[in-house]
A protein has these predicted regions:
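Exposed loop/turn and edge beta-strand positions of beta-sandwich/beta-sheet ligand-binding modules
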Residues: 40, 73, 116
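Conserved catalytic-core motifs of GNAT/GCN5-like acyltransferases
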Residues: 32-38, 101-103, 109, 134
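Core segments of cupin and vicinal oxygen chelate
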Residues: 14-53
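N-terminal beta-strand motif that seeds the catalytic metal site of vicinal oxygen chelate
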Residues: 1-19, 74-79, 135-139
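Helix-adjacent hinge/juxtasegments
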Residues: 56, 63-80
Length: 139
């Protein structure tokens, strides 16, 4: 007998300021917000494709990553996009740069990653690491 997984259902991450996180995930990244059950704590849910979600939870202890920059070896989740080029252009239009002095606006790009698919890494406002990847390099 095996676990027999269907898919990754959701990832939950701690956030310290829900309004700021909603602006980042909803307004900036353009993820559609989902209806969230009436829990006794604040949060927001976002769709990341069919039957997959990102759950933001306001958590007093925040994140373990305070003061850290973008590090692909740290805890992170990945969003697969259709076009690496389009994602890179979108992030640059939002102000992300590889040489940004502000960690929150710095992106780390790895178009020919050892993993076998192109990757971009950024931080959310609470310094949670987000990987954005594509099936292939389309630069």
């Amino acid at each position: 007998m095996a676990l027999d997984p269907e898919s990754l259902h959701h990832v939950s991450i701690p956030v310290s300021d829900l309004a700021r996180s909603r602006r980042f995930y909803g307004d900036m990244l353009g993820l559609p917000e989902m209806t969230r059950p009436p829990f006794d704590f604040p949060g927001a849910w976002y769709s990341i494709g069919p039957n997959q979600a990102l759950h933001l939870i306001v958590y007093a202890n925040q994140t373990f990553r305070t003061g850290k920059g973008v590090d692909s070896r740290d805890i992170h989740y990945a969003i697969r996009v259709k076009s690496y080029r389009q994602a890179l252009e979108f992030l640059r239009a939002q102000g992300y740069r590889e040489d940004a002095t502000d960690d929150l606006m710095r992106m780390r790009i790895n178009p020919r990653a050892t993993a076998g698919f192109p990757q971009i890494y950024i931080l959310d406002p609470d310094r949670n690491v987000i990987e954005i990847n594509a099936r292939e390099l389309d630069l």
